[in-house]
């Protein structure tokens, strides 16, 4: 964001915008809204999580492939910590990922804490 706001106010607005972007991306992923998820990433963005270190667009592609293989997951997010770095930002957060499946005829949910 740019404008004539005092720097502290601008920083708070930028942190809020990044936090909302992270939430929109996660909800889009959990609901399978792939185009909306893709819109959350710049082409040169980087995603570093437990199973991938790639660009944002590659992360979306691989997430969609997982969903197409019926690997479903839902995310419960912790607080989002945003660090502003000139024209970029770093968002960090913990999450719990719930993965439902059937094991020997019994429905189970495995929860991964990150």
Give the location of each predicted region.
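A solvent-exposed, acidic/Ser-Thr-rich amphipathic alpha-helical stretch
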Residues: 34-102, 106
